[in-house]
């Protein structure tokens, strides 16, 4: 029996996080990301989340920052119907690998967002650096820029004092 369960457990472990394993903030971030994705004019078909590969949230004074990496696949529904439960994933439909960075305040209002979902074959290394920079800007949304200090930030001021 164990010989049958071990491959199943290993297979499920490599599939990424399930939607049930996401925190409340991560669920809200995923919802905001899907809404944002389906707003874009080039998107004609509804897409469905096939896996969540990475999910992290960080609490800041201005709110909660959520970073999600997930995969989408095209369904048989038009984009206006993306919320419908009966939309089936097309076996040969387009696939997208997404990075979403969402900043939520204490009332679940969106302070900042960045959603990037290129077609999976178009993912390039240069874009990853630009996405990380955009994600960092979203992470700092609503924060006081003077609430934290970097090492050595005041070293020159003290050195110039008599």
From Swiss-Prot:
One GO term of the biological process aspect: positive regulation of fat cell differentiation
Subcellular location: Secreted
Annotated coiled-coil segments of the chain: none
Database matches in Gene3D superfamilies: 3.10.450.10
Organism per entry: Bos taurus
Residues spanning the signal sequence: 1-20
Residue ranges of the propeptide: 156-162
Cited SUPFAM superfamilies: Cystatin/monellin
Post-translational modification remark: Secreted in an inactive precursor form, prochemerin, which is proteolytically processed by a variety of extracellular proteases to generate forms with differing levels of bioactivity. For example, the removal of five amino acids results in chemerin-157, which exhibits the highest activity, while removal of six amino acids results in chemerin-156 which has slightly less activity. Some proteases are able to cleave at more than one site and chemerin forms may be sequentially processed by different enzymes to modulate activity levels.
Alphabetical keyword list: Chemotaxis, Differentiation, Disulfide bond, Inflammatory response, Secreted, Signal
Gene Ontology molecular functions: signaling receptor binding
Full protein name: Retinoic acid receptor responder protein 2
Any one Gene Ontology cellular component term annotated for this protein: extracellular space
